[in-house]
Amino acid sequence: MNLIQQLEKEQFDKLSANKTIPEFGPGDTVIVNVKVVEGDRTRVQAYEGVCIGRSGGGINESFTVRKISYGEGVERVFPILSPMIDSIKVVRRGKVRRAKLYYLRQLRGKSARIVEKQDRQQAAVNE
């Protein structure tokens, strides 16, 4: 392990010690609570959408969330360890076969929906 990797690992451990980051991936619907600064006040704003991809690793890891706001597609990229992220919550798991869901940018309406992932144990209980 070279010096840069060692320093990045130390920084990652230090930054992630006080944060709980849930397991999520592309296709999952997430709510990201973001700290917004307005003048001298800060408030928490919820940003809910579909994770269309994760990129990078370690300190540099980020994820992209896409939502439809007033009929217009809005995408936002969040660094995983950003101090502006208050919390991340996974609402539902999506069943996808791609790591990057950029094709959703061209789809509208029902065709842009993602099927919910069913766990094997959960499916066995339901039957």
Curated annotation (Swiss-Prot):
Gene name of the encoded protein: rplS
What's in the GO CC field?
Answer: cytosolic large ribosomal subunit
Query: Gene3D superfamilies recorded for this chain?
Result: 2.30.30.790
A Pfam family annotated for this chain is Ribosomal_L19
Keyword presence, Ribosomal protein: yes
> What's the superkingdom here?
Bacteria
Q: Which UniProt keywords apply?
A: Ribonucleoprotein, Ribosomal protein
- Listed name of the protein: Large ribosomal subunit protein bL19
Quote the PANTHER family the UniProt record gives.
Answer: LARGE RIBOSOMAL SUBUNIT PROTEIN BL19M (PTHR15680:SF9), RIBOSOMAL PROTEIN L19 (PTHR15680)
What is the similarity comment for this entry? Belongs to the bacterial ribosomal protein bL19 family.
Q: Which GO terms describe its biological process?
A: translation
Protein purpose? This protein is located at the 30S-50S ribosomal subunit interface and may play a role in the structure and function of the aminoacyl-tRNA binding site.
Q: Which GO terms describe its molecular function?
A: structural constituent of ribosome
**InterPro entries named in the record:** Ribosomal_bL19 (IPR001857), Ribosomal_bL19_CS (IPR018257), Ribosomal_bL19_sf (IPR038657), Translation_prot_SH3-like_sf (IPR008991)
